[in-house]
Design a protein with these regions (language model features):
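Extracytoplasmic and endomembrane cell-envelope/extracellular-matrix remodeling and assembly machinery
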Residues: 33-70, 77-84, 103, 157-194, ...
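Active-site-adjacent structural elements in enzyme catalytic domains
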Residues: 109-139
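Bacterial N-terminal signal peptides
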Residues: 4-15
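Boundary at the C-terminal end of the N-terminal hydrophobic targeting segment
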Residues: 19-23
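Signal peptide-directed extracytoplasmic domains
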Residues: 70-113, 119
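Short, conserved phosphate-binding/catalytic loop or strand-edge motifs used
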Residues: 137, 148-155
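Short acidic, glycine/serine/threonine-rich helix-capping segments at coil-helix boundaries
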Residues: 347-352, 360-404
C-alpha cells in the first residue's frame, strides 16, 4: 500500500507539470521493491532447498521445526561483505586477544573447571590451558558466542553470500545435527558466519569432532562445558596434537640468518644454524619452522606440530599465536620477550592491492590483487627484497611499498 501511495504522488506531480521526481521517494520505492523481490526469491530458494534436504534424508519433522519461519537476514550479508580498511597489525590483535583481563578470566575458568579440563587433557593429550585458551579466544569464555540463528545465517549465506556452495553444505549439516537430537532448532545459535557455541564449531566440524563429554547422550557445545572441552580437545587431537610437546618457543636468530627459509627442519638443524631459545633450550622437534609474523624487527618463533594443529582450527598465524601465548599465560609461563615494531604504520587494504599489482608489474608474480597478504604475496615480496639486497622477511611496510612504486613506474 505504501508503494502504491508513492506512485500516486509521482503521478500527481506529472499531472501538475512538475516532471522531476523526488529522489528520496523514488529511493524508498526502489528499496522496498528490491526487498520484496529478494524476499520472494529467497522463499522460493528455501522451498527448493527443503526438497533437496528431504532427499538427503532429513526428516519432515526437522524440516518443519528448522525451516518454517526462517528469514533472510540482510545484516548477515552486510557482515559477509565487510572488508576493513586497515590490515590490523598482529601486535594490536594480540593486545586484545591476550589481554590481562582475558588471562585472569582464563585462570579463573580453569580453576572452576579444573577437574573436567584435566580429564580431557588425560584423554586427548591436549593441555588444559590450551583448551581454555581456545575457549577464551573463540567466545571470551562463553560470554560472546553470538545470538544469530545459525539456520537463518546459513540459509542467507547459501542464498546470497560469497561462498554459497560452502554455506549450503553447512546448512545441510546443521539440519543433520538437529535431526540427530543434539540441539533444538531454536537453540542453535552462533556467529553471523554459522560458527556455533562456546568454541565456534561450524556444523561440519561439529559433525566430525563434537563429543558428548558429560555422557547425557547429546553433544552440546552451547550449554555443557564438559562437551565443549571434550570437543575442543578432540579437534586438536585429530588435527595432530602431540602430547608432551610444546607448541613452540620464542627464539633468537643469528646475525646473517636467511629469513627466506620457509621449510621445516629439525631442532638440531636449526640449532646448527645458530638459532637459540630466548630462555632455556630449544624443544626437541623433528619438524619445525621459523615464524616471524612481524618481520626481522619483531619476535621470532620456532613452531612445531602443535602450532600446526592450532592452525587447523583457524588457519591464521595471528590466531595460533594468540591461542599459544594465552595458554602459556594462563599456565603462568612468561610471555613474548622481544618487542614488536609498533612504529610501523599499518598498510590499508588498498595499499596491499597496490603492492601486489606493483610486484606483478616488476616480474614477481603473486596472482590477483585481493588486498590480502597471503603466502604468494609474501613469497613474491621476499624475492623482491632479496634481489634488492634487503632482508627477505616478507613483511610489508610503507617503505617497501614506496620502493615498489618507484620501480614499477
Amino acid at each position: 500500500m505504501y508503494a502504491t501511495f508513492l506512485l500516486a504522488v509521482g503521478a500527481l506531480a506529472l499531472c501538475s507539470g512538475r516532471v522531476q521526481a523526488n529522489p528520496q521517494l523514488m529511493s524508498e520505492v526502489d528499496t522496498q521493491a528490491a526487498t520484496e523481490v529478494s524476499y520472494a526469491n529467497f522463499q522460493q530458494w528455501l522451498r527448493d532447498f527443503r526438497q533437496y534436504a528431504a532427499g538427503q534424508g532429513i526428516s519432515e519433522a526437522t524440516l518443519n521445526k528448522a525451516l518454517d519461519g526462517v528469514r533472510y537476514r540482510e545484516r548477515v550479508i552486510e557482515l559477509d561483505g565487510y572488508q576493513p580498511e586497515f590490515v590490523r597489525p598482529i601486535w594490536e590483535y594480540l593486545d586484545t586477544a591476550v589481554s590481562s583481563t582475558r588471562i585472569t578470566n582464563g585462570q579463573e575458568k580453569l580453576a572452576d573447571h579444573r577437574n573436567t579440563a584435566q580429564q580431557m587433557e588425560q584423554r586427548y593429550g591436549v593441555p588444559a590451558e590450551i583448551i581454555v585458551a581456545i575457549w577464551g579466544i573463540e567466545s571470551n569464555y562463553g560470554s560472546n558466542f553470538g545470538d544469530f540463528s545459525t539456520l537463518e545465517s546459513l540459509a542467507t549465506l547459501a542464498y546470497d553470500g560469497r561462498r554459497r556452495d560452502f554455506a549450503r553444505g553447512e546448512l545441510l549439516a546443521a539440519l543433520r545435527i538437529i535431526d540427530q537430537g543434539d540441539i533444538a532448532a531454536e537453540d542453535m545459535k552462533g556467529s553471523w558466519a554459522g560458527a556455533m557455541g562456546h568454541t565456534q564449531f561450524i556444523p561440519s566440524s561439529f559433525e566430525a569432532y563434537a563429543v558428548d563429554g558429560d555422557g547425557d547422550g547429546r553433544r552440546d557445545i552451547w550449554d555443557s562445558i564438559p562437551d565443549v572441552m571434550a570437543s575442543t580437545a578432540n579437534y586438536l587431537d585429530r588435527a595432530g596434537w602431540q602430547s608432551g610437546q610444546p607448541w613452540g618457543v620464542e627464539v633468537r636468530l643469528p646475525e646473517g640468518f636467511d629469513y627466506a627459509q620457509t621449510e621445516r627442519r629439525s631442532s638440531a638443524e636449526w640449532r646448527n644454524q645458530g638459532v637459540q631459545a630466548q630462555q632455556g633450550e630449544l624443544p626437541n622437534f623433528d619438524s619445525a619452522a621459523i615464524v616471524i609474523p612481524a618481520g626481522a624487527n619483531g619476535p621470532a618463533f620456532l613452531v612445531g606440530a602443535n602450532f600446526r594443529a592450532i592452525l587447523r582450527y583457524n588457519n591464521a598465524t595471528s590466531y595460533a599465536l594468540a591461542v599459544a601465548t594465552l595458554g602459556d599465560a594462563i599456565a603462568g609461563r612468561e610471555g613474548i620477550q622481544h618487542s614488536w615494531p609498533r612504529d610501523q604504520a599499518p598498510l590499508t587494504r588498498d595499499d596491499v592491492q597496490e603492492l601486489q599489482r606493483a610486484l606483478n608489474r616488476v616480474g614477481y608474480s603473486v596472482g590477483g590483487a585481493d588486498g590480502v597478504m597471503g603466502p604468494n604475496t609474501r613469497q613474491g615480496l621476499r624475492n623482491f627484497q632479496r634481489d634488492q639486497g634487503l632482508i627477505p622477511d616478507g613483511f610489508a611496510t610503507q617503505e617497501l611499498l614506496e620502493q615498489l612504486r618507484q620501480r614499477s613506474q
